[in-house]
Amino acid sequence: MKIISLFFFLGILQVSYSQEAPIIPSPEKPSVTDNILFELKDWDPIRGLWLSESIMAMSTNQVIPDRTFAEELTPYELLSLMPKEKREDLKEYIESNNTGAQTTNNSFTTLLLALINNTFCKTIQGRSYGDPHLKSFDNATYSFQTVGEFELSKSSDRNFEIQARQKAQSDNFSLNSAIAMNVSGDRVGFYAEDAPSRNVTPLFLDGAPIQLQGRTYFLPHGGTIKLNGSNYIITWPTGEILILNNRASGGRNFINVTVTIFECSTQTYSGLLGNANKNINDDFNGRNNNQSPPVYQAFSTFGNPLMQQASIIAEKEYLSYLSQSFADDWRVTDMTTLFDYSNGTNTASFTDRRFPMVHLTVADLNANQQSMARQRCEAMGISLDEMGGCIFDQGYLNIAPNPVPSPSLATEGVVLNKLERPLLNTNTHQILAPKNPSGEAQPKTPSENTIEERPGKTDIKTYENNNTIVKPSQPIQIKVPNNNNKPAPINTNKPINTSPVIPGKNEKPGKG
């Protein structure tokens, strides 16, 4: 009886209290984004936190936080080092749960899913080399002796763009003298010649000269620049790679260009390197796919036996199309250029629509010249699809054969040892890689791990993490969101971040 009376009294008290006390809401169910952030941090408390914050920043076109570990990696590169099973689980979770209702940041999950997909994807390459001979992403090859500034390749989200400046070597030959690019919002220029100001460095970031100081340079929006031999390697935070090989011929400096993108990318591409749609036959149709190339495009400009069946008139007509109508479609304007200019110059200053005066081909070389050039190209391991361009450059300009560069990936040999605490790693504040529990040094990345702090900058910016990551209520098990990404704005001013600006010193043989 006493127990019943006590329960009755407590019941009355509870009803009375519930009528007067405010209702406290129960904790909200963790969102898809919350669960993903938890999983990334659970994988690696320090690197995973930086990775999640970086991808979040990238999804809104913001500057990423400073690295808190010794490895000199982009967000994509770090993600690719995550165990395969973990990446597969995240991919499945995003695809099955991203309905929009639970997702607090669709742009974040969309970008993360794209990055994960790229880690499982093959890459494809486009090239512009020598007196420029171009190979598209779909393996179409052609010769492009023109003068001016051109859109080499551009993605539909406009976070990836590369432009090439071609400069006359003589009346009939031209070379790549400068390359400009948009690296996810950072405007980078590389000038083998005609730099916008007198500096010993060929590199410019948002119009100001920079030096690599013998190590990887971190770009504000997550990309990196490093020097490997004579190759400058620019890596996008999303994984695309540009290799610039700095060379010389006839007293002039020039650049061979190799561009690597993902075969499975959801982006569409435009420019001289084609649309990467696996169709070799539409790479010469112009910007709006509305050009009508001469029928000669079916034949090779360089040494293909079928060329002998084509008339000289048809051949010249084809080359004329490439250097005029096709070229004009891909010229940049004062509104679209990414290049830096000295006072009084603009893109028109580097344009000559009369060029070349005469269209020359391998067929204009005598048999002995062709044979000697071919032998040297073969000895250097030049591939079949670039053989014609190599013979041309050897025969006319004596340019040494240049095989496609294949530097080591930044992730090669990297082991992610456990970190006990964050280690600030910026362009101005460099760190000594921590020791393993065994006392041995961590394995080195392809670039220097041991770095010193440089004088001259004391306002080092650090990022505090105030995010609370909610532990998921159930294991990750992972609907593709709408793409809300906006194109990254190009910064035309000097960046304000921890990156210092330091003044100072299959295969198809084809048409190029």
Name what the model sees in each region.
Residues 14-18:
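Sec/Tat signal peptide C-region and signal peptidase I cleavage site
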Residues 4-12:
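Sec-dependent N-terminal signal peptides
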Residues 414-512:
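Extracytoplasmic low-complexity, disordered linker/stalk tracts in cell-surface/secreted proteins
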Residues 20-108, 113-424:
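Von Willebrand factor type D
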Residues 6, 281, 298, 339, ...:
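N-terminal start and proteolytic maturation junction detector
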